[in-house]
Amino acid sequence: MKTKEEHIGHWVNQSIDDWEAAELLFKGRKYLHSLFFAHLSLEKVCKAHWIRANESNIPPKTHNLIFLLSNTAIELTNEQKEFLLELNRFQIEGRYPEQISKLFKISTHTFAEEKLAQAKKQQEWLLNKLQ
């Protein structure tokens, strides 16, 4: 049976792997997909925080970053909340064909580069908070 720290480590490692995928997708000019994986990376580090803050080692099956962090000791600024809400779109809306065309239009190189930089900053901040 895994310890709480082993569960947290699993989610952290998955977050790092997904971040590498986001970077590769960006380099391959798959901007929408890179933002999907950036969200996935943040989701997994948020789940690590959720495990740390809760009795259970199994986080809720949700993709909502703010919901996951609302059940932890992490305090977000309004700016962070706005960014995480925006990033949530790429996980939820990015799954459905009727929404994908809208997201493709806004997912330019410049847009994705800016959002990935913000996401990386959030990922590093959240990873540091786990230590």
Task: Identify the residue ranges that each predicted region occupies.
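Terminal alpha-helical segments
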Residues: 1-131
